[in-house]
Design a protein with these regions (language model features):
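Conserved alpha-helix/loop element of class I SAM-dependent methyltransferases that forms part
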Residues: 18-38, 48-52
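Class I SAM-dependent methyltransferase SAM/SAH-binding core
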Residues: 40-95
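A short acidic, Gly/Pro-enriched loop at the edge of an enzyme's catalytic core
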Residues: 93-105
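A short SAM/SAH-binding and catalytic strip from SAM-dependent methyltransferases
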Residues: 103-116
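A short glycine-rich, Lys/Arg-flanked "PGG" loop and its adjoining helix->strand segment in the class I
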Residues: 118-130
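Conserved beta-strand signature within the Rossmann-like core of class I S-adenosyl-L-methionine
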Residues: 131-139
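Short alpha-helix
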Residues: 164-179
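Core SAM-dependent methyltransferase catalytic element
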Residues: 185-207
Length: 207
């Protein structure tokens, strides 16, 4: 009961604050305007990315979000958006996505929480149209062993408090393993962010 209350009422606010930090918002502001056509946003959350889409370039956003608490918090944001936003209340691993149906798939600060990221990413690749793009920005495993060691130590405690967030996943490796071809990538520590959660990988990939 307490766990359910935490996940429904407390966690969405905590994640909204963390994912809305200035250094994270800067990453979003650089990535999201590149989206075009029919868009699938994986882990839509509280709708933080909406402010950065260019409505003139997109036709629809399908918002994949299994959390009822997140969807409820995002509702007022969606209400004022000029492009249709359609909810898909499922996880990325189980969602029935039509093959080759999206021009852009957006993955921002979500891969860390997906229970089976390999299965999810394989499904996303099939849902991307030929010539489409996967836009991603994710935190993950640091290249410095001292930081990585602390990530491994802290992760078991961190995960239940942070909605299942893993600190030790390698976003680029997961994306490549799923069959995507990364066409552009940049990585490094975000400023004014604890290094255990601040190693960021962002870029674009094709199916």
């Amino acid at each position: 009961m307490i766990s359910q209350l935490y996940e429904t009422h407390v966690l969405p606010h905590l994640i909204g604050c963390a994912c809305g930090a200035p250094q994270i918002m800067k990453q979003r502001s650089r990535l999201i305007p590149q989206a075009s056509g029919r868009v699938l946003e994986v882990g839509f959350g509280t709708g933080t990315n909406l402010a950065f889409y260019d409505p003139a370039k997109i036709t629809e956003i399908v918002a994949l979000e299994p959390s009822e608490g997140m969807r409820r918090k995002a509702a007022p944001v969606i209400a004022g958006f000029p492009v249709p936003v359609t909810w898909l209340a499922e996880g990325a691993e189980t969602a029935a996505l039509e093959p080759q149906s999206f021009d852009t798939i957006v993955l921002t600060y979500t891969a860390c929480t997906i229970p089976d990221p390999d299965r999810a990413l394989a499904s996303l690749r099939k849902a991307l149209k030929p010539g489409g793009q996967l836009l991603f920005s994710e935190h993950g495993l640091a290249p410095d062993e001292g930081v990585a060691r602390w990530q491994r130590r802290i992760e078991p405690v961190w995960k239940p408090l942070a909605g299942g967030c893993h600190l030790t996943r390698d976003p680029a490796a997961m994306i490549t393993r799923a069959g995507f071809s990364i066409t552009r990538i940049e990585a490094g520590y975000l400023p004014k962010t604890p290094k255990i959660a601040g190693y960021n990988t962002a870029g674009c990939a094709a199916a």
